[in-house]
Amino acid sequence: IVRDDETLEPFRPHILSVVDVFSGMGVATLVSKSNSLSLTRLLWKAIDKFGKPDMIKGDNGKDYLSKDFQSLLDGLNITYDAAIAYAGEQKALVERRFGTLQHAGISKMHGHIGNNLAKREMIEQKTPKKDRRAKDEYGFAKKTNQKLLHTFSEACELLEAEVIKWNMSKVRRKKGVKTPLELWNS
């Protein structure tokens, strides 16, 4: 959970990510709302970093299958292969990246609500019941301790730092296996 930069209202942002299959290099962005415009921005960011792909394997959500996004892909001559619903193994690299990001530095951010419902409920239970029904200093309902929440722009910078760290890091990789950045540069 982060706070809006202007209104300071807490909200839950979305993480959008692209991962290069060969190297494992990734690009990710934090958006307030996942829609075709935010996907288009992410695609241009990925093209700027990796070049134009021949094919993208992705989600089957309405924003991914929208007319705007699909016409952009058609115009760029990029084939889109939508994964079957609820089949995360079909886009395993991206799902693994989300898991890594959720368990890494993002889990240390103020306002992190866990990576599953049980953890979220456990975190919310740490806040006294009377406080969960109360309002924060900005007048918004608080379910968790939201006093130290990052702003949206701060959270974007933290996410970008985690992506860079992942791309350059050998942490928890098998001995002799190159980092994504080393694979990309080879």
Task: Kindly give the residue locations of the regions a language model identified.
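A short, conserved beta-strand element enriched in hydrophobic/aromatic residues
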Residues: 1-48, 52-60, 82-85
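Globin-like tetrapyrrole-binding proteins
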Residues: 60, 70-185
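Extracytoplasmic/secreted cell-surface and envelope-processing proteins
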Residues: 64-67
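Distinct, well-ordered alpha-helical segments
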Residues: 43, 69-70
